[in-house]
C-alpha cells in the first residue's frame, strides 16, 4: 500500500468510528430520557385492540414508515398515514380502538396539528413523540414522549 492509500484507509476508519461514537452517545442520551410516559405508551400498544397508525411529515414521515413496517412485520397490525392525506379524507382508516403515533421533531408541523381534533373526535389514543415537550403537538396528544437527541 502507498502512503496515500494508508492515509485514506485510516481516514475512512476514523470517520466510521467517529460516526459510531456519535450514534452511541445519542443512544445513551435517549436511554436516559425513558420514563413512565414511555412505559404507558408501550402498555397502550400491547393492549391495542385495533391497529397502530403512525404519522409524520418529512424525515419524521420516513421514520414513521419504517416504524409501521417494523410493527407489521413483527405481528402488530400497523399502517402509515400521511398527515396531508389524513386531513383530506383518509382519516377513515382510523378507528376508536387504534393507537395513533404522531412523530414530529418540532411538534409544530401544521398538518400534524390539523389531525388532532379529528383524532380526538374518533376517540383513539394519541402518542406524540417530539423533541419539544412544550410544543402544541406534545400538549394536545393523549400522551407525549420526549425525544431530545
Segments from the language model and where they lie:
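Glycine-rich phosphate-binding loops that contact phosphosugars or nucleotide phosphates
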Residues: 46, 50-149
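An N-terminal, well-structured beta->alpha segment
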Residues: 1, 5-50
Amino acid at each position: 500500500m502507498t502512503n496515500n492509500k494508508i492515509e485514506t484507509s485510516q481516514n475512512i476508519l476514523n470517520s466510521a468510528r467517529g460516526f459510531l461514537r456519535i450514534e452511541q452517545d445519542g443512544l445513551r442520551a435517549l436511554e436516559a430520557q425513558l420514563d413512565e410516559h414511555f412505559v404507558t405508551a408501550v402498555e397502550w400498544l400491547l393492549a391495542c385492540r385495533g391497529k397502530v397508525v403512525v404519522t409524520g411529515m418529512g424525515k419524521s414521515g420516513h421514520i414513521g414508515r419504517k416504524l409501521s413496517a417494523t410493527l407489521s412485520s413483527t405481528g402488530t397490525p400497523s399502517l402509515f398515514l400521511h398527515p396531508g392525506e389524513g386531513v383530506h379524507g383518509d382519516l377513515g382508516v382510523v378507528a376508536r380502538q387504534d393507537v395513533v403515533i404522531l412523530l414530529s421533531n418540532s411538534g409544530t408541523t401544521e398538518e400534524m396539528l390539523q389531525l388532532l381534533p379529528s383524532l380526538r373526535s374518533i376517540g383513539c389514543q394519541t402518542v406524540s413523540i417530539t423533541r419539544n415537550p412544550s410544543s402544541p403537538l406534545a400538549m394536545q396528544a393523549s400522551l407525549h414522549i420526549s425525544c431530545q437527541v
